[in-house]
């Protein structure tokens, strides 16, 4: 089958395994809190993020409170996640910008979101697709990279280039699904160290 047919079939097969695919980030109740969760999750497991956000949102539930938070307190709360010092600075700066310019609520536009400190193409699209199914782009993390390259959907290694390769293969209406499904498949089945072979789909199409 050609690359577009393979991409379509792969998504269908993974969707059979995870029909209700959604984020594994927890403890959030508002769009602002969800954005903070995603920002903290870069290069860090969702499980680790979930350990810190309960305390973080218990003390700082919204952009207003987080915008005036003491940097040392935030750093201390999130110190168990990777790059915690940088992330602490970013979430406070983002909270200030959102409070001043958007009444504390993150915008629903992928370009506007990327103007916030610590929010890139991936973070913006995870936020928009998981919350709103907005289909403004495909978010690519390490799991999406592995799945896409393993099945030959891309030869690129740069996440942004891979995102654009996938956006050419999938109809826009399906963009929101790609990250959610590929992440779960890559995290639990097509794992980096050892694949769960009996659950791997379309084995005959694997190129890596």
Regions found by a protein language model. Name each.
Residues 2-208:
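Catalytic cores of DNA base-excision repair glycosylases
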